[in-house]
A protein has these predicted regions:
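Bacterial Sec-dependent N-terminal signal peptides
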Residues: 1-43
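Alpha-helix termination/capping residues and helix-transition junctions
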Residues: 30, 181-183, 244
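C-terminal "post-core" interaction segments
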Residues: 37-40, 44-51, 89, 156-157, ...
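Low-complexity, compositionally biased segments
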Residues: 7-13, 61, 73, 312
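Flexible, low-complexity junctional segments that flank or bridge functional domains
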Residues: 35-222, 228-235, 249, 291, ...
Length: 351
């Protein structure tokens, strides 16, 4: 009757890039301008492209030590399989297989004919989400503001679903939503299957649930070519919003489809007062993704800057909820979402 949907994470090709170079995008915590770190050139043949890709990752990928990946062994294993006579499709499959050794959803190989991706961070787990159920709860009388669908449920619990942090979100959008939800006994923020997007939108939303500037994590960047050549940790704060802020209990719903910017949003919300996280462990994805171009014009995206929580703990492999709840099949068949119903009961009992 109802489908327990899995949606793939966003896998759009990166914009920009500079030939044979690592393109470092502007990021406020350590750069005031964009830069490109030049790497040595390689011939445009299968061996040359293999060596170029391996070298890019060797010098710039940020999770080798944390994930205990022996990248030299990977080189030894895969270089034996490279043949200058292999066609593009065969080369792509081999290089993508090599990149999957990193088990990183932020690692993609972009070609004109396919996109290499690692999606096991959510495909190997129960989705705990159904888009059909969300449509039932929202019905037809919901509002839309800045990519957020929201309404007040019949027990006076506010509900909002934000499925993509790439969707525009302005301060005025949030003012309208929070003002409408002010009469509710509590608020459910559903970000299940949100594969990420703009960190600025994630932080803009999170800031509406803090009453003071709050440390939520740390960031580092590479300072050299070694696997452990990192800068000192830079503290990352959620700044106090001067706009309307929500003061009642909040429950954030999560599943394995919460990745990248959504993982960062969940991490921030853990430090907000009156907020609890309910559902399943998130999908992770805490490395800031940069991109580089290979000799043949293919593009590789990868995690280049690690981020941590406020205790300097890794969140690359996800964040556990405060309250673990799975979507029960018997509820699914009845048109009920176990996570939403559990959150509603908790919020009503607190009122």
């Amino acid at each position: 009757m109802f489908s327990n949907n899995k949606y793939p994470a966003n896998a759009q090709p990166p914009e920009g890039g500079c030939s044979f170079a690592l393109c470092v995008l502007p990021f406020a915590f350590f750069l005031l301008f964009s830069a490109c770190v030049e790497i040595e050139e390689y011939p445009n043949n299968p061996h040359g492209n293999f060596e170029a890709l391996w070298k890019i990752m060797d010098e710039h990928y940020c999770f080798f030590e944390y994930k205990e990946v022996d990248w030299d062994k990977v080189h030894s294993d895969y270089s034996k399989r490279i043949d200058n006579n292999m066609n593009n499709e065969s080369l792509f499959k081999l290089l993508d297989e090599m990149l999957q050794e990193l088990k990183d959803g932020h690692v993609n190989l972009y070609t004109p004919f396919d996109v290499g991706r690692y999606w096991k961070w959510h495909e190997d787990f129960p989705p705990n989400f159904s888009a059909d159920l969300i449509d039932i709860y929202l019905n037809k009388d919901y509002s839309i503001s800045g990519g957020i669908r929201y309404k007040i449920l019949d027990d006076n619990v506010g509900y909002m679903y934000y499925g993509d942090f790439s969707n525009g979100l302005g301060e005025t959008n949030l003012d309208y939503i929070i003002d409408k939800m002010a009469i509710c006994s509590g608020l459910i923020i559903d970000v299940r299957n949100n594969g990420g997007g703009l960190l600025s939108n994630a932080e803009k939303l999170a800031a509406r649930f803090f009453n003071e500037k709050t440390l939520v994590g740390y960031l580092q960047h590479k300072t050299g070519k070694g696997h452990n050549d990192f800068s000192k940790p830079f503290p990352h704060y959620i700044e106090l919003s001067t706009r309307l802020r929500y003061q009642k209990p909040v429950i954030v719903l999560t599943n394995r489809g919460c990745f990248s910017a959504t993982n960062d949003f969940i991490n921030s919300m853990r430090y907000a007062p009156n907020v609890r996280i309910l559902g399943d462990r998130t999908g992770g994805g805490s490395g800031l993704p940069f991109n580089s171009e290979m000799p043949n014009g293919w593009m590789v995206r990868f995690s280049a800057c690690p981020s941590f929580d406020a205790d300097m703990q890794q969140i690359e492999f996800g964040i556990d909820p405060d309250i673990s709840v799975e979507l029960k099949n018997q509820d699914l068949q009845k048109g009920k979402d176990t996570l939403i119903e559990t959150a509603r009961a908790l919020l009503v009992s607190k009122h």
